[in-house]
Regions:
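Alpha-helical transmembrane segments of multi-pass small-molecule/ion transporters
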Residues: 1-59, 63-287, 291-341
Length: 341
């Protein structure tokens, strides 16, 4: 992890502060940006989100799915957590905390919007940062690559139905055409574009050329992420100044679900006798979220001023420190993990 990525929480916090201040003092400018949209797609946000997502997807080798059979137990556990546990546990936690336990501290009528953001966050398995987490816990690189490729392929067809199901169960209305448009814009098109660009770069310049391009695009992707956050918090500056406690309250269910899902994946892998070098990244992939996609979908579905967009951004704020703590737990418990029952 580079110096910039290592301090991502600091940069995110600074962008949140700057965006909130600018939105509070320059509301007219941000209102004009918010109106720059076509078919409910905010154009400045769409450009930034593509710049943010495509370089990350460029790292994914979909040919690695041929290796899935080598680690079928770890793959199975991770798929179970990512698609059958995490989205549903997040919806449940959001319902318990935001609709009930914290209802008195939240802005009236916003709980459902925050829950929608949490669902969008949990339904998208992490794509890019898991390579960093896997490396930090000495994970099997082939397992990580094949798991990420498989998750991304599943996400193309499963993200919209899972999100629609959970939003429906939470009594949150979302038009299918808007959801399909968001999936097309922010999953299908970027996946196809990244896969085609990756193939072209490998054909013309080889692996070394691809890695050189990835190094150059890395800062661009992170800069787009930070500008996206600045815009999001600028759009919501006044609301945040009036309700600073909201961010801390939204973070509570996110924190619980990260540690719950990481722990569950880790323990199930141990019960199945899976090697630690696979169980570590399995737990990390099971717990982390593709927050870039969640932000994009929240903006497309509910708008830049929505509580859903704010909830997904809280996921960005806490992602790095929380996942680093999971890495430390995985590494510190390796001796215990490898002592068979």
């Amino acid at each position: 992890m580079g110096r910039f990525e290592r301090h991502l929480t600091l940069w995110v916090t600074l962008c949140i502060a700057a965006g909130t201040a600018l939105g509070h003092f320059l509301p007219a400018a941000f209102a004009a940006l918010a109106r720059t949209e076509v078919a409910r797609v905010n154009l400045p946000m769409a450009v930034l989100i593509w710049l943010m997502i495509i370089p990350m997807l460029l790292k994914v080798d979909f040919g690695a799915m041929r290796q899935v059979g080598q680690h079928w137990k770890g793959i199975g556990v991770t798929l179970l957590i990512n698609w059958a546990v995490k989205p549903f546990s997040m919806a449940l936690l959001g319902w318990l905390f935001l609709r009930h336990a914290f209802a008195g501290w939240l802005p009236p009528g916003q709980a459902d919007s925050y829950i929608a953001g949490l669902i969008l966050l949990a339904a998208a398995p992490c794509t890019a940062m898991v390579f960093v987490w896997s490396n930090l816990c000495r994970g099997d690189a082939n397992f990580t690559l094949s798991q990420v490729a498989l998750n991304d392929a599943i996400m193309v067809v499963a993200y919209a139905p899972v999100v629609a199901l959970l939003l429906g169960l939470s009594a949150i209305s979302v038009p299918w055409n808007t959801l399909i448009l968001s999936v097309g814009l922010y999953i299908i098109v970027p996946v196809i574009a990244a896969a085609a660009l990756r193939r072209m770069l490998l054909a013309r310049h080889g692996q070394a050329g691809l890695e050189a391009v990835l190094r150059r695009l890395g800062p661009l992707s992170l800069a787009a992420l930070l500008l996206t956050l600045l815009l999001l918090f600028g759009f919501q500056g006044r609301q945040i100044v009036q309700q600073p406690l909201v961010i801390a309250l939204i973070a509570v269910p996110i924190l619980i679900q990260v540690y719950f899902n990481a722990g569950l994946a880790y323990l199930v892998n141990r019960q199945l006798g899976v090697a630690h070098c696979v169980a570590g990244p399995s737990a990390l992939i099971g717990a982390s979220n593709f927050f870039e996609l969640a932000v994009a979908t929240a903006v497309g579905l509910f708008g830049v001023h929505s509580g859903a967009a704010l909830a997904t951004v809280v996921g960005v704020l806490i992602e790095v420190p929380v996942m680093l703590s999971v890495v430390r737990i995985v590494n510190a418990s390796q001796g215990w993990y490898e002592r068979r029952r």
